[in-house]
């Protein structure tokens, strides 16, 4: 009996001391160098499955969890055609990229965005990306993770930054293991990676843009850019809809930049992959045959 008590105490101590960031994080790997449309689709599905809260859904669209659900983070490893890898760390509740890791001189090198470095989550990023304290080294990202901050470092708006599998593949090699690279090079890689990973997971429309233009570089159109900036209000509008009708019209943009007025969930449902967490109950399904696939 005494031995059992000791074992229980040891297990509880381990659980208390073990950093929450290490709980059940599975790394999702995407082989960018050998990518196909089907492999990219599978990659997106893996992110959806690991990120979503399995108990939350509005009108058939899965929702991300609140900040209390563990694991709190996702790791996404991107591998180029030369087998070089960069691992992105994403917050599970919103898919924001917090930082990334590569290998430098045989050690795990972690990079943390400036706006994350000033928070209590900094240690989570460091220990999750590079768990071994004796084999890690840090290299700061001296700017924030917002689009305006990234665009400022790149020197042009993201509407003028090409996306595409080959662009993503080549970007990995410009960072991995490199002693010194410019902030412009880093920010351009991150702009591409964030849109092709996080934004594509949030929006089926962006995922489909990548698949449609799979073998060529492309510029994000006005609809892509607008969706990226409207995820929160889109999620709230869908969450608050009454039997498919939005409580107020949602003004968005079409691909050509013209005005797109959304009145019903089914107008935008095909474009959405994941909803941002919104507190409170919502209709899990449409109370008609509008969504036969559910």
Curated annotation (Swiss-Prot):
One of its GO terms (cellular component) is extracellular region. Keywords: Antiviral defense, Cell wall, Disulfide bond, Hydrolase, Plant defense, Protein synthesis inhibitor, Secreted, Signal, Toxin. It is found in: Secreted, Cell wall. It catalyses: Endohydrolysis of the N-glycosidic bond at one specific adenosine on the 28S rRNA. Its main location: secreted. It comes from the Eukaryota. The keyword Transmembrane does not apply. Disulfide bonds join 58-282, 108-130. GO terms for biological process: defense response to virus; negative regulation of translation. The active site is at residue 199. Pfam families: RIP (PF00161). Gene3D superfamilies: Ricin (A subunit), domain 1, Ricin (A Subunit), domain 2. InterPro entries: Ribosome-inact_prot_sf, Ribosome_inactivat_1/2, Ribosome_inactivat_prot, Ribosome_inactivat_prot_CS, Ribosome_inactivat_prot_sub1, Ribosome_inactivat_prot_sub2. Belongs to the ribosome-inactivating protein family. Type 1 RIP subfamily. Inhibits viral infection of plants, and protein synthesis in vitro. Has also been shown to inhibit the replication of mammalian viruses. The protein may provide a means of cellular suicide upon invasion by a virus. Monomer. This is Antiviral protein alpha. The lineage of its organism: Eukaryota, Viridiplantae, Streptophyta, Embryophyta, Tracheophyta.
């Amino acid at each position: 009996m005494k031995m059992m008590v000791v074992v229980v105490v040891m297990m509880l101590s381990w659980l208390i001391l073990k950093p929450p960031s290490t709980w059940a994080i599975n790394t999702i790997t995407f082989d960018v160098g050998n990518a196909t449309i089907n492999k990219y689709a599978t990659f997106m599905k893996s992110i959806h499955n690991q990120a979503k809260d399995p108990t939350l859904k509005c009108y058939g669209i899965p929702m991300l969890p609140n900040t209390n659900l563990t694991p709190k983070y996702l790791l996404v490893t991107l591998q180029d055609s030369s087998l070089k890898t960069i691992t992105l760390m994403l917050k599970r509740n919103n898919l924001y990229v917090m930082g990334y890791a590569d290998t430098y001189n045989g050690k795990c090198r972690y990079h943390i965005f400036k706006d994350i470095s000033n928070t209590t989550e900094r240690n989570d990023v460091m220990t999750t990306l590079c768990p071994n304290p004796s084999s890690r080294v840090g290299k700061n990202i001296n700017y924030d993770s917002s689009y305006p901050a990234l665009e400022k470092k790149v020197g042009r708006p993201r509407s003028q930054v090409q996306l595409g599998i080959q662009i993503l593949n080549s970007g990995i090699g410009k960072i991995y293991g490199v002693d010194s690279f410019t902030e412009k090079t880093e920010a351009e890689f991150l702009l591409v990676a964030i849109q092709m990973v996080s934004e594509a997971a949030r929006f089926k429309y962006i995922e489909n843009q990548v698949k449609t233009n799979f073998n060529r570089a492309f510029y994000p159109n006005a609809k892509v850019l607008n969706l990226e900036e409207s995820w929160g209000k889109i999620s709230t509008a869908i969450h608050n809809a009454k039997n498919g009708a939005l409580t107020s019209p949602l003004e968005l943009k079409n691909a050509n930049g013209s005005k797109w007025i959304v009145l019903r969930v089914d107008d935008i449902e095909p474009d959405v992959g994941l909803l941002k967490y919104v507190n409170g109950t919502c209709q899990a399904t449409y109370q008609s045959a509008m969504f036969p696939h559910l």
